[in-house]
Structures are given as C-alpha cells and as structure tokens.
C-alpha cells in the first residue's frame, strides 16, 4: 500500500473536491505515480488515515456485496443530520433503514412512476422546451446561461411528485422572458452572452439550493461539527429552516386532516398521487390497525419522519436531473458529430407529427433506441457526478490484500475511465472473484478519455448495459432509490431537447469543461446557443 502524508493541497482537493477541475475528481488520484490501487492518506498531522481505493471492480464489490464490512461513512450523514435527523439517509444500514425504505418504496415503484410521474414529467419537459425557445428567440443567436432553466424545471417536477401541487415556475419564467424581449438591448457581438431575465425561483427552491450549499460547505470543512454549528447560528439559516418546517408541516397536517375521514377500506383503495399522500396514507393505516386515533395530528416523532423523508426526496430529486442534463448538453455541444448521430437515431423512430406535435411520453419511454441509451450511459460515465463514495469499515477487513482496521474512512472511486492495474485474482475478495463475469470489460482498450457512446453498443448495434460497470447511482442496498425516476426524466428531457434544438458551438471562453463540487460534480459553465428546429 502506498502511503502519502502531509497537507498536500492537490491531494486534499482531489479527495474533498474543493477546487475547480477539468477531470473527474478522484481520477487517477490513488494511482498517481504510486503504482497502487490502494493508498493510505494522512491529510493532517495526528489525523486518522483515509484509504482511497481506485479499482472499479473492487469498488463495485464493496458497494454491492460487502456491506457488513463497509457501511456509509458518518461524514455524509452528519452533514444532513442537523437538517434531516430522521431521514433514511442518516441511518446506518440495518433494520430501521430497511424498514423506512420499504415504507416509501411505492413512490419509486413502476405503478406510481407510470400513473403519476410520466404525465407530470412530460408536461414539465414541454414547458422547458417552450422556455428555451423563448430565450433562444430573445438571444438572437447569442449564447445564454441555461443551468437555472434545468434547475427550476427539475424543481417543479420533483415538488409536484413529492407534494402534489403545481408551482408554475417554468410558466412564470417564460412569461417573464416574453415580457422583456422587446425592451431588452442585446450586446452587439453574437459571441457575447445574451441578456436574459433572471429566473425567479420559488421560495422553496431557493431554500433547497441554500441547504444543498450548506451541506457541500460542511463536507469540505476540516472541522465539520464546528462548521455546521456555525452555519445553524446564522439568521439566514434560521429563516429558511423555519420556512421549510412551517411549509412542509402544514402540508402534512392538511393532508392528514383530508384523509383522516376515510375508512380503512377507502384508504386501501386510494390511489397515491404524491409522496406526501403515500406517507400520510400509510401512516393512517398503521394507526388504524394499531387502534390509535386518526382524527388528531400525528405525534411529533411520526410527523418528523415523514417530513424529513419528503424533504430528502425533494433535495435528491431536484439536483440530480439538472446536473445530468447540464453535462449531457455540454457533451452535445463538444461533440457535434455525436449530436447529429443522436438526432438522426431519434428522428428515425420518433418523428414529429405533420403539425409539429411532439412524440408522446409513452413512445419516448417505451421505444428501443440503442444510440439514445448509449448516449445516456456515456454521459453518466463521463460526467462522473458522484466522484467519491465514502464508506467506513465496521470491522477489521482486507482490500486487495491490504489489511484495513475497523473505523477507517474508505474513499471509493466510481469513475470508469482510468486503466486498471493488473491485480492478481487471489488478492481479490471471494465475492469479487465470483462476480468477475458480471460485466464484459472494466476498461476499453482504445482508451476512455474521449466521449464515445458507441462503446456501449454491441456488434449488432444493440445497447449493452453490461459492457462496463456504471456506478452513477452507487450500488447495493444504499443505491439511490430514485434511480428509475431520474433515468426516465433524463430520457424524456434529452429526447425533446435534441428533437427541438440544434446545439451550436460556443465561444471558447463559454465552453469550459471545468467542474465544481456541490452535492454533485457539476459544470462550472452551462451555456447554450440554440437553433430551434
């Protein structure tokens, strides 16, 4: 095992994501001229060691098969615990965690996604297209910043899915653009960013973004406990926390009051229309079966569990789509040949109607389009939105032949891109050896630095999801349980964007592929120059 000591700024930045980078954060971090897939870092004097594991096959095995040896590191749960102390994210992998996951599993199940999520995500995606079309007209061929568009569209959908009400954020943003178009004087140069009205995000969207930023700051802090305490003392934190609590608690109570008059049979037959209804309905059924009253507000502990899980879903679902969509659009711009190939693949099977009507959401989600699926998979691989997955050893164990004591933080690099070292099979765990054939390869012999969706296609042109591992949503029991929703949303939005716009080249100073770390690795710049189709 290679050992690195001292406060090396480059190493610290690679580990905690505190710098702006062009490449995924931990790419080659553990193998940097050390010829080892496992290194031991001492990030500060007298600190406990941190282990970095940079072998995707072993990372996949640890996440999927060795959860009794590696549980979630307390660093991430601690960052959320002061905000959401009762959500499943902060719980150790065990009976309480699994029970809470089962309680909410209906929200991510196929019936809910098809009946509730599909029409809502389609409407939001069409709203995003209309907003971008209005902005493109106002820009007059100039580039404009689009991350806020993706952000507010993602928030509108996840808010509707979680709480069941419409915030009309996309419609309001478009109306603001339409009202300002005729009175706005644009820069003379077509390469200068257009002057576009700033999107007014809903108050809860601003609150979510604020709390995400505080979590990101605490994760980068040397003294996380002190930093979190300091943030909680700030007036702005207290205001946004009070707003969040009063809003969500009010929605929980109003929904409980509305459903409390239903009988057990009626509650059983009730179709869940949001995550809020799911949580309240199931809690009311539990109270009825336990002989507890349902015509009074939930006990504080019950309300807190519902509240925290709902807000956790809101936070997770909000940023995932915006970041994935941003990177996929940047890859479209940087690779015009891939953009045209994707558009042709879509037009061949999802042509617009004679009157310009869009393909239906059912057609988008059910039609097999191998190149679309390959493009999505390659986008997720290259974006590497979660560049470090942190676990802590719960017992003395081994990784690739190296002894790791109990209680040590282990940083796992999920990036599929660097050439793996040649590691003897006998050094791998038994579960790793047994699962070797789960994927056809762990490395592309032609190299993986370039953006190549074709690497995910079989010789007959079909999409092969087992070509390489994909750890965008982690793996094992702690895999993101919003994965199916995120992939559906990603697909619908990407299809409609490519069918409705050509993403033209940008000036060099607006086309940087540098990233910055918040909750996810996100692009530092997110500009587009659109030609409506």
Residue ranges and their predicted role:
Residues 412-461:
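Conserved cytochrome P450 K-helix/beta-meander segment immediately N-terminal to the heme-binding cysteine loop
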Residues 521-533:
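C-terminal helix/juxtamembrane-tail motif
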Residues 320-333, 493:
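Short, small-residue alpha-helix embedded
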Residues 379, 404-407, 451, 476, ...:
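Hydrophobic, well-ordered secondary-structure elements that form the walls
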């Amino acid at each position: 095992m290679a050992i690195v000591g001292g406060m090396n700024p480059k190493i610290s930045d690679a580990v905690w994501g505190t710098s702006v980078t062009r490449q995924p954060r931990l790419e080659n971090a553990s193998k940097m001229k050390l010829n080892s897939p496992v290194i031991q870092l001492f990030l500060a004097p007298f600190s406990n060691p941190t282990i970095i594991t940079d072998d995707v096959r072993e990372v996949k095995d640890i996440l999927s098969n060795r959860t009794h040896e590696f549980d979630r590191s307390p660093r991430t749960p601690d960052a959320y615990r002061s905000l959401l102390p009762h959500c499943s994210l902060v719980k150790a992998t065990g009976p309480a965690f699994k029970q809470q996951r089962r309680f909410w599993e209906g929200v991510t199940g196929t019936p809910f996604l098809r009946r509730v999520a599909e029409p809502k995500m389609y409407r939001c995606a069409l709203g995003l297209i209309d907003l971008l079309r209005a902005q493109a007209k106002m820009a007059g061929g100039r580039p404009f910043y689009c991350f806020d568009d993706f952000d507010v569209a993602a928030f509108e959908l996840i808010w509707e899915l979680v709480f069941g009400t419409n915030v009309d954020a996309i419609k309001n943003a478009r109306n603001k653009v339409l009202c300002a178009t005729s009175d706005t004087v644009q820069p003379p140069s077509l390469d200068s960013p257009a002057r576009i009205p700033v999107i007014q995000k809903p108050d809860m969207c601003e609150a979510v973004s604020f709390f995400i930023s505080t979590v990101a700051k605490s994760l980068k802090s040397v003294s996380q406990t002190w930093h979190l305490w300091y943030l909680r003392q700030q007036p702005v934190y207290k205001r946004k926390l009070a707003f969040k609590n009063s809003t969500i608690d009010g929605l929980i109570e109003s929904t409980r009051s509305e459903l409390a008059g239903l009988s057990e049979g009626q509650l059983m037959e009730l179709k869940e229309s949001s995550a809020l209804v799911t949580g309240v309905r199931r809690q009311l059924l539990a109270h009825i079966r336990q002989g507890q009253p349902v015509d009074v507000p939930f006990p504080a502990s019950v309300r807190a569990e519902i509240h925290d899980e709902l807000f956790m879903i809101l936070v997770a679902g909000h940023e995932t789509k915006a970041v994935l969509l941003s990177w996929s659009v940047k890859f479209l711009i940087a690779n015009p040949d891939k953009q045209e190939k994707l558009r042709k693949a879509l037009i061949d099977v999802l042509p617009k109607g004679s009157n310009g009507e869009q393909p239906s959401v059912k057609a988008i989600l059910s039609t097999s389009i191998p190149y679309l699926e390959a493009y999505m998979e390659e986008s997720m691989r290259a974006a590497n939105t979660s560049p470090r997955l942190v676990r802590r050893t719960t017992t003395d164990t081994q990784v690739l032949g190296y002894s790791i004591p109990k209680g040590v933080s282990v940083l796992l690099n999920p990036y599929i891109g660097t050439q793996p070292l040649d590691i003897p099979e006998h050094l791998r765990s038994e579960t790793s050896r047994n699962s070797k054939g789960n994927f056809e390869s762990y490395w592309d012999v032609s190299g993986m630095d370039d953006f190549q969706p074709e690497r995910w296609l079989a010789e007959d042109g079909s999409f092969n999801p087992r070509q390489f591992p994909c750890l965008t949503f982690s793996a094992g029991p702690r895999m993101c349980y919003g994965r199916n929703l995120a992939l559906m949303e990603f697909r619908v939005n990407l299809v409609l964007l490519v069918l409705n716009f050509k993403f033209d080249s940008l000036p060099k100073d607006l086309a940087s592929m540098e990233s910055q770390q918040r909750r996810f690795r996100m692009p530092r710049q997110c500009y587009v120059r659109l030609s409506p189709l």
